[in-house]
UniProtKB/Swiss-Prot annotation:
EC number of the protein: 2.7.2.3
Organism domain of life: Bacteria
Keywords: ATP-binding, Cytoplasm, Glycolysis, Kinase, Nucleotide-binding, Transferase
Primary location recorded for the protein, binned into one broad class: cytoplasm
Species per Swiss-Prot/TrEMBL record: Dinoroseobacter shibae (strain DSM 16493 / NCIMB 14021 / DFL 12)
Subunit comment: Monomer.
HAMAP family the record matches: Phosphoglyc_kinase
Annotated catalysed reactions: (2R)-3-phosphoglycerate + ATP = (2R)-3-phospho-glyceroyl phosphate + ADP
Residues the entry annotates as binding substrate: 21-23, 36, 59-62, 114, 147
Record localization: Cytoplasm
The protein's name: Phosphoglycerate kinase
């Protein structure tokens, strides 16, 4: 992968159209999680330091090509100004002359790109209209890179283009994790359904040395091996697919790790009475809601031998104690190895980040991706249009 960064661009006196992802949660008109806003600060700061005028392009929600007032980006303005420590000009529909008349140190936020029907269609006319506003295009929205939209893909083919600091960090971390990794490589994949992560599992077994499967997905694999999983969430219709993945892994020399012991309960609620049992002894009326301590001990051994770890999805029902034990313990083991300098750890996906934050170890991982769908599609081995456009620029 080769792409230009801000270091390769002459920005002084230039209008820099900067695609960012500030699609943040909002309640009662207030941003409730500023993580994505905070992570674009280095890019905006660097553009200003190099004499450029950043014009921020972003989407918010899914207005589907129509103006929806409650999805205006104006709502993020206070949080954006606080993160940057400077005022931001909100110009819903900027034109070139207006931008050229602004003082050099100005930051501009344009209106929701998805208000325009041409955005999600990657309409060439919209891409050209956007490109006419600036001199340079900077994509700092890896989390939107799996979408071939006018502001992520079309525009990059019309202007000198580069990756912003967050995009650069994401791409370098992911390349380090799966492109040219330090081996052995272990992937942890959790979540509810095999059907949503088929492409991911199929790609990973050919690229990693160890694959840890957790959450509801593990139940499907256990059932495919003839193990009774009781009343647990499981996709029994995916049994043949699960067996095919296991056979593919065996051919590729990838070891699959499933729970050895399980935590079961008859109610899915906080504080519900639970038991820890061997994986083969799940009661018919009970649900598997977490992996047990024997499984965690085995995972710690896998992590101790590994040099690179990629994590997507929790190992159990981490939202509800006590079914967060395996996720928390495994996360802490990975974090400890990272701090000791023996393991490179990269994690992504909404539930994954929430689980690592809950375990209190997110800051100890080598890299936490802000992307959801883009992170998954990259792990699936797919080409991301927003990245491909930068490579072609």
């Amino acid at each position: 992968m080769t792409w230009k960064t801000l270091d390769d661009m002459a920005l002084d006196g230039k209008i820099v159209l900067t695609r960012v992802d500030i699609n943040v949660p909002v309640a009662d008109g207030v941003v409730t999680d500023t993580t994505r806003i905070e992570r674009i600060v280095p890019t905006v700061t660097d553009i200003l330091a190099k004499g450029g005028l950043p014009v921020l392009l972003a989407h918010f929600g899914r207005p589907k090509g129509k103006v929806v007032p409650e999805m205006s980006l104006r709502v993020v303005l206070p949080a954006l100004e606080e993160a940057l420590g400077r005022p931001v000009e909100f110009i819903a529909h900027p034109d070139r002359a207006a931008l050229e008349a602004l003082p050099k140190c100005t930051v501009v936020l344009a209106e929701n790109t998805r208000f325009a029907p041409g955005e999600e269609k990657n309409d060439p006319e919209m891409a050209a209209a956007l490109a006419a506003l600036g001199d340079i295009y900077c994509n700092d929205a890896f989390s939107a890179a799996h979408r071939a939209h006018a502001s992520t893909e079309g525009i990059a083919r019309l202007l000198p283009s580069c990756a912003g600091r967050l995009m650069q960090a994401e791409l370098e971390a992911l390349q380090r994790a799966l492109g040219t990794p330090t081996r052995p490589v272990v992937a942890v994949v959790g979540g509810a359904k095999v059907s949503t992560k088929l492409a991911l599992l199929g790609n990973l077994v050919e690229k990693v040395d160890d694959l840890v499967i957790g959450g509801g997905m593990a139940n499907t694999f256990l059932a495919a091996q003839g193990i009774d999983v009781g009343a647990s969430l499981a996709e029994h219709e995916m049994a043949d697919t699960a067996r095919e993945i296991m056979e593919k892994a065996a051919r590729a020399g990838c070891s699959i790790h499933l729970p050895k012991d399980i935590v079961v309960a008859r109610k899915f609620e906080a504080g519900a009475p639970s038991q820890t049992l061997p994986v083969s002894e799940c009661p018919r009326d009970a649900m598997i809601l977490d992996a047990g301590p024997e499984t965690v001990a085995a995972l710690k051994e896998v992590f101790a031998q590994a040099r690179t770890l990629i994590w997507n999805g929790p190992l159990g029902a981490f939202e509800i104690p006590p079914f967060d034990m395996a996720t928390n313990a495994a996360a802490r083991a990975a974090a400890d190895a990272t701090k000791a300098g023996t393991l490179i750890t990269v994690a992504g996906g909404g539930d994954t980040v929430a689980a690592l934050n809950k375990a209190g170890v997110a800051d100890d991982f080598t890299y936490i991706s802000t992307a959801g769908g883009a992170f998954l599609e990259w792990m699936e081995g797919k080409t991301l249009p927003g990245v491909a456009a930068l490579e072609a620029a």
